[in-house]
Amino acid sequence: MKNIPSKYKKLRIGLIILGASTILSSNFFTSINTAYAESGKDSELPKYTLPEGVPTNYNVLWNDEFNGNELDQTKWGYLYSSFDTRAKTQMHFTDKPENVSVSDGVLHLTARYSPTREKWNSETNQMETVPRTNTRKDKDGKVIEEYPAPFTSGAIQTVDSNGNVKVAFKGDYYAEARVKLPMSESSWSAFWMFGTKYPDWPASGEIDILESKGYDPNYLQANVHSPFKVGADYSQQNAKRIPNNGDTQTDFHTYGVLKQSNKMTFFYDGKPVHTVDYNKLNVKTPFVDPDNTMALRFTHIVGGSFLKDGKNSPRDFTDATKHIDSYRDGSRSDMLVDYVRVWQPEETTTEDSTTTTTTTEEPTTTTSTTTEEPTTTTTST
């Protein structure tokens, strides 16, 4: 193992700040396995240890070590209200400290049982307490059903609630987070990236670096979602049984993705577990379009069809209302993130140490709504 200083100098990368938008990119194509933190705060640019054989020209370009006592809103925005109700999820995302907090160098996304909410009654001109519910709609916006959603939880992304991109990445990069997963049976935790150029899912592309099922600590899924195409599957999914005796919920592990010009490789604790060749995707546009920058997102979803325990299983974890006790005090339903980092390659500078950057572009936006009424976000992990 060798120690590589994290230095910003000599990086011939595009670092473009336009209002609320920061685009980080590189055009130099190379490979990297994974990297681990030793110590240090964001501002100190600490050293990181890279496995032998990893090119030494990859440096940390952007990171959050969560060393403060609150979320850094120059880097992150909150997700609000309902999310992915097509999968019949049962929570509302909030920005409340009981759902999103930072302490002792760790981000906490905590799900809790919270069966009611306050709603404004325009007829009485006062707030009233009502059951917390979600609404499923068809593709035309027609309501299919309203169902109980008695939980709150936390989710953050590098896009604000108005759709303004704070940070997004393009070119070659390696993104990694160190995470400890919640124990609650109906928790669906994820670390993922999504495109910012195209307005609809899955046209924008999606990279699921980590998806987990609370009832199965040995389960790991890494996915790529590409645009719909008639007669083709839009998802390239890969589920793994990880040989760690189920300690993903009692210890931290690293989850990463190396995105390159022709493929992406997923990593668990520094070991490659899955590779996706773009040429095998039905549509590879989101992953090769240099203007489709990728933003980061952490979500702690409660309930939903992703949690189905196999075909004909007698166990049901899709309905979190059967596991309310696991969410009452947050002790079992806490998703912890130690850090998130993005590396990009350092290019060789000329003798006069001149550098180049990518061309500028207008800030990108994605659709995100904050409202008192639960809103349905159609993006799916």
Model-assigned labels for residue ranges:
Residues 1-17, 31-36:
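Bacterial Sec-dependent N-terminal signal peptides
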Residues 9, 24, 29, 356, ...:
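Intrinsically disordered, low-complexity serine/threonine-rich segments
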Residues 16-24:
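Hydrophobic helical h-region of N-terminal Sec-dependent signal peptides
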Residues 24-42:
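Sec-dependent signal peptide cleavage junction
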Residues 38-356:
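GH16 jelly-roll
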Residues 42, 348-381:
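Ser/Thr/Gly/Pro-rich low-complexity, disordered linker/stalk segments of secreted
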